[in-house]
Amino acid sequence: MRALIQRVTEASVRVEGAVIGRTGPGLLVLVCGMPGDTDRSVAALAGKIAKLRIFRDAEGRMNRSLLDVGGGALVVSQFTLAADTSRGNRPGFSAAAPPKEGERLYEAFAAALAETGVAVETGRFGANMAVALVNDGPVTIWMEG
């Protein structure tokens, strides 16, 4: 699974103009299931993200995790994280998991992150979504697991 995480002061996702998920201070997590991903690898990535020390402590150092600060997570599926731009000018996305498996992995990731104790809200798999965020820092990290 690929994940692009962004530390945010707030983030929301809309489908057809209606907000379907939002978080206050915490993380926006864009995820893409990949062939070969397992429930175990997805859960491990979720656990790593929950414990990743990218929030400021009292001295201003990135030394606290999402769990430490009691932050939430907005999890949004994004198959374009599997883009192959090595040939031509149009990216290919065949490296992403097929849609049914991608949806299963997305749901498994959101559930695994919630099981760590993080308050999780989600987008809608396969929908055309409008994501709004205020990046804090900015802190943006690419992860694979």
Swiss-Prot record:
UniProt-listed SUPFAM superfamilies: DTD-like (SSF69500)
InterPro entries: Daa-tRNA_deacyls_DTD, DTD-like_sf
Transmembrane segments: none
Pfam families given in the database record: Tyr_Deacylase
GO molecular function terms listed in the Swiss-Prot or TrEMBL record: D-tyrosyl-tRNA(Tyr) deacylase activity; Gly-tRNA(Ala) deacylase activity; Ser(Gly)-tRNA(Ala) hydrolase activity; tRNA binding
Superkingdom: Bacteria
Cellular compartments per GO CC: cytoplasm
Enzyme Commission designation: 3.1.1.96
Chief site of localization: cytoplasm
Catalysed transformations (reactions): glycyl-tRNA(Ala) + H2O = tRNA(Ala) + glycine + H(+); a D-aminoacyl-tRNA + H2O = a tRNA + a D-alpha-amino acid + H(+)
Subcellular location: Cytoplasm
Motif, Gly-cisPro motif, important for rejection of L-amino acids: chain positions: 137-138
Biological process (GO), any one: D-amino acid catabolic process
Keywords (A to Z) from UniProt: Cytoplasm, Hydrolase, RNA-binding, tRNA-binding
Quaternary structure annotation from Swiss-Prot or TrEMBL: Homodimer.
Family per similarity comment: Belongs to the DTD family.
Its job: An aminoacyl-tRNA editing enzyme that deacylates mischarged D-aminoacyl-tRNAs. Also deacylates mischarged glycyl-tRNA(Ala), protecting cells against glycine mischarging by AlaRS. Acts via tRNA-based rather than protein-based catalysis; rejects L-amino acids rather than detecting D-amino acids in the active site. By recycling D-aminoacyl-tRNA to D-amino acids and free tRNA molecules, this enzyme counteracts the toxicity associated with the formation of D-aminoacyl-tRNA entities in vivo and helps enforce protein L-homochirality.
HAMAP family in the record: Deacylase_Dtd
Domain notes from UniProt: A Gly-cisPro motif from one monomer fits into the active site of the other monomer to allow specific chiral rejection of L-amino acids.
Protein name in the entry: D-aminoacyl-tRNA deacylase
Record gene name: dtd
